Amino acid sequence: MKYNYSEMSGKYRTFVPNMETKIETTNTGGKVLAYDGDELVGRLVFSFKGNVLSIDHTYAYKEGIGVGSLLVSAVNDYAVSKGLKVLPVCSFAVVWYQRHPQFQDILACKD
């Protein structure tokens, strides 16, 4: 899947105009890759545990331009579209969900 958030309205408009994401999945998890034009600027790694998508790592190769937020937003949208709950494990994702209370209903409870 490929998203260009510059074409979206509202909550995603803060990102660099040419930034796009691509989601790749396997049976056990996947990754979200962020591109600024042709340049890879970040990635997010996630795993599946039943109906829970666990955000394990977020890497931004360019800081301060919204790469991390773009990655978490993209995986959040993916989880919603698949009916999955989200477990933010990496510290960036934990803080992102704290700052976006409108998505609290998608969060899985930690056991």
Task: Place the predicted regions along the sequence by residue.
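Short, Lys/Arg-enriched N-terminal segments with co-localized hydrophobic residues
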Residues: K2-N18
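A short, internal acetyl-CoA/4′-phosphopantetheine-binding micro-motif in the GNAT/acyltransferase core
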Residues: H57-G64
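Short helix-onset patch at the extreme N-terminus, typifying the N->h transition
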Residues: E7-M8, E24-N27
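C-terminal structural segments of small proteins and small subunits
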Residues: Y78-D111
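Core catalytic alpha/beta fold that binds nucleotide/phospho-ligands
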Residues: E20-K22
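Conserved acetyl-CoA-binding loop-helix of GNAT-fold acetyltransferases
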Residues: I65-D77
